[in-house]
A protein has these predicted regions:
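Membrane-embedded alpha-helical bundles that constitute the cytochrome b-like, heme-associated redox core
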Residues: 1-198
Length: 198
């Protein structure tokens, strides 16, 4: 009975983690558009994005703990840390492991955002899109709820909305402005004076 409880917890935490990750990515895309200008944007909007990311990490951790505690699948500690070595559905589990490490990398660099060059932070942050794709594949290939109608409908809606948001963001992104060197103009020399540089 206890083992069955762990299995239900593993399934529920995995699905909710994926949904919260979806919400975090969508909210991040909204913040990067002109809907909320940075100068007028309340601090809680960015805090909500960070909170969703942290909540996703917590739910993934709960998902992993429940998987390890459950006896339904022969998955051990190494299997949830090293990709594609699990004896049970190695590809599906491996995709989830890669998504987990990618998610942790994004979260750690976000916490250290002020200490990193913006270009590096932004490049790592783009991994979030790949994390969503890997998490989706993991849920479809490894999830035992993939046959449920509610799961299928929710999954299709989440994927379509996220895909549309990503395409919209890429199509309306603001080009990076490059600094243009200023041309220094020297005042003309007065009549009767000599310029040593000439």
């Amino acid at each position: 009975m206890i083992s069955q409880g762990w299995w239900y917890l593993a399934r529920a935490s995995g699905i909710v983690a994926w949904l919260v990750l979806t919400a975090s990515i969508l909210w991040g895309i909204v913040l990067s558009t002109k809907a909320f200008p940075r100068r007028r944007r309340p601090a809680w909007l960015l805090d909500l994005h960070r909170w969703l990311g942290g909540l996703t990490i917590g739910l993934v951790a709960l998902h992993v703990v429940a998987i390890l505690a459950d006896s339904y699948t022969p998955i051990g500690l190494v299997d949830v840390a090293v990709p594609f070595v699990s004896p049970w559905r190695p590809v599906a589990v491996g995709l989830g492991v890669v998504a987990m490490w990618a998610l942790l990398t994004v979260q750690v660099t976000s916490l250290a955002m002020r200490r990193l060059p913006r270009r590096i932070w932004h490049g790592v942050h783009l991994v979030s899109y790949g994390t969503f794709a890997l998490g989706t594949l993991h849920a479809v290939l490894a999830g035992t709820d993939r046959g449920a109608m509610l799961f299928q409908v929710t999954g299709v809606i989440a994927v379509l909305v996220t895909a549309w948001a990503v395409v919209y963001r890429l199509a309306h992104r603001t080009p990076v402005r490059r600094a243009v060197p200023r041309t220094v103009t020297r005042p003309p020399a007065e009549i009767g004076t000599s310029d040593p540089a000439l």
